[in-house]
Swiss-Prot record:
Function field: Component of the cytochrome b6-f complex, which mediates electron transfer between photosystem II (PSII) and photosystem I (PSI), cyclic electron flow around PSI, and state transitions.
The keyword Thylakoid belongs to this UniProt entry's keyword annotation: yes
Intracellular or extracellular location(s): Plastid, Chloroplast thylakoid membrane
Membrane-related topology note: Multi-pass membrane protein
PANTHER family named in the record: CYTOCHROME B
GO BP terms: photosynthetic electron transport chain
Name recorded for this polypeptide: Cytochrome b6-f complex subunit 4
Transmembrane segments: 36-56, 95-115, 131-151
Disulphide bridges, residue numbers: none
Subunit structure as annotated in this protein's UniProt entry: The 4 large subunits of the cytochrome b6-f complex are cytochrome b6, subunit IV (17 kDa polypeptide, petD), cytochrome f and the Rieske protein, while the 4 small subunits are petG, petL, petM and petN. The complex functions as a dimer.
Family of the protein in this entry: Belongs to the cytochrome b family. PetD subfamily.
Native source species: Emiliania huxleyi
KW Nucleotide-binding (keyword) present: no
NCBIfam families, per the entry: cytb6_f_IV
Length: 160
């Protein structure tokens, strides 16, 4: 028994739909009007309803009030800046830190050119892009966790 539904290309109705351009190069239903008119608004309204519902049912506390006369012991950036903060903190030379952050978008720009070597490759399977994504995600989490630790444990996370 197969999990995938294979199209019956001998079916004249399916051939007529594919000849009209319905679907893509693979078997499927058209985006217009099925997705754009029916599924997208349901997803958007569902997301908005979830956000409003969570905001009403579980409001986030603001925390303690700011005191302009007391400096906190450790000043940390927002959570989404943790990886870059840790990278700048760990690399001793500031120029190397900035260049290492500039290397990230440059490396991401080169990925499509590396992937495009095999023209007959299935566009849904991108091994290089998948590996770059997994490595980047793992590195970002690792550096983000390390940003909350002392600088002696920033890269090893206390494991080594």
């Amino acid at each position: 028994m197969s999990i995938l539904k294979k199209p019956d290309l001998a079916d004249p109705k399916l051939r007529a739909k594919l000849a009209k351009g319905m679907g893509h190069n693979y078997y499927g239903e058209p985006a217009w009007p099925n997705d754009l008119l029916y599924i997208f608004p349901v997803c958007i309204l569902g997301t908005i309803a979830c956000c409003i519902g969570l905001g009403v049912l579980e409001p986030t506390p603001l925390g303690e009030k700011a005191d302009p006369f007391a400096t906190p012991l450790e000043i940390l950036p927002e959570w989404y800046f943790f990886p870059t903060f840790n990278l700048l903190r760990v690399i001793p030379n500031k120029l190397l830190g900035v260049l290492s952050m500039a290397a990230v978008p440059i490396g991401l720009i080169t990925v499509p050119f590396i992937e495009n070597v095999n023209k007959f490759q299935n566009p849904f399977r991108r091994p290089v892009a998948s590996l770059v994504f997994l490595f980047g995600t793992f590195t970002a989490f690792w550096l983000g966790i390390g940003a909350t630790m002392p600088i002696t444990q920033a890269l090893t996370l206390g494991f080594f």
